[in-house]
Amino acid sequence: MAEERKLYVCMRCGRTFSKSEMEILPGIRCPYCNFKIIMKVRSPMVKRIPAI
């Protein structure tokens, strides 16, 4: 199974980074500007489910 890379975006500086880059600092913070509020990027693929 291929490892899926999770991407995050900083709400202050707008840079995109991975979880491994985020682990440089203690806690959950942007590795570039040290801001606490980050957002996980959703995958561009739409998940379709059948109607009941």
From Swiss-Prot:
Comment on bound cofactor: Binds 1 zinc ion.
A GO molecular function held by the record: DNA-directed RNA polymerase activity
E.C. number: 2.7.7.6
Residues that, per the record, bind Zn(2+): C13, C30, C33
Catalytic activity: RNA(n) + a ribonucleoside 5'-triphosphate = RNA(n+1) + diphosphate
Cellular component GO terms held in the UniProt record: cytoplasm; DNA-directed RNA polymerase complex
SUPFAM superfamilies, per database record: RNA polymerase subunits
SMART domains: RPOLCX (SM00659)
Cofactor(s) in the UniProt record: Zn(2+)
Localization of this protein: Cytoplasm
Primary localisation category: cytoplasm
GO biological process, one term: DNA-templated transcription
UniProtKB keywords: Cytoplasm, DNA-directed RNA polymerase, Metal-binding, Nucleotidyltransferase, Transcription, Transferase, Zinc
Domain of life: Archaea
Disulphide-bridged cysteine pairs: none
Quaternary organization: Part of the RNA polymerase complex.
HAMAP family: RNApol_arch_Rpo12
Function comment: DNA-dependent RNA polymerase (RNAP) catalyzes the transcription of DNA into RNA using the four ribonucleoside triphosphates as substrates.
Similarity section: Belongs to the archaeal Rpo12/eukaryotic RPC10 RNA polymerase subunit family.
The name this protein goes by in its record: DNA-directed RNA polymerase subunit Rpo12
Organism the protein comes from: Pyrobaculum calidifontis (strain DSM 21063 / JCM 11548 / VA1)
